[in-house]
């Protein structure tokens, strides 16, 4: 016969939630630093899309 599970305490929920938040924060920081290092290594702080000359023509 099926028995209901015990209820998880609020402190355990909070601890697990904080661990999850820290993991996501550090992955965001790591990916951001990777993007920064790649943009500086290519010489452009903000890389432009293909076919973009940077000059506008007046018609």
From Swiss-Prot:
Per the record, which residues fall in region Disordered? Answer: 37-59
* One Gene Ontology term from the biological process aspect of the record: translation
Please report any disulfide bonds recorded for this protein chain, giving both cysteine positions.
none
Keyword Chloroplast set for record: yes
What are the recorded GO MF terms, alphabetically? structural constituent of ribosome
User: Has the keyword S-adenosyl-L-methionine been applied to this entry?
Assistant: no
List keywords of the entry alphabetically. Chloroplast, Plastid, Ribonucleoprotein, Ribosomal protein
> A single GO CC term, please?
large ribosomal subunit
Family statement drawn from the similarity comment of this UniProt entry: Belongs to the bacterial ribosomal protein bL32 family.
Q: What is this protein called?
A: Large ribosomal subunit protein bL32c
List the source organism: Hordeum vulgare (Barley)
Q: What lineage, starting at the top, does this entry show?
A: Eukaryota, Viridiplantae, Streptophyta, Embryophyta, Tracheophyta
Q: Which gene encodes it?
A: rpl32
């Amino acid at each position: 016969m099926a028995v209901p599970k015990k209820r998880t305490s609020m402190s355990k929920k909070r601890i697990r939630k904080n661990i999850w938040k820290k993991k996501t924060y550090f992955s965001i920081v790591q990916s951001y630093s990777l993007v920064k290092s790649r943009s500086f290594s290519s010489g452009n702080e903000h890389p432009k899309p293909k076919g973009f000359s940077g000059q506008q023509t007046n018609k």
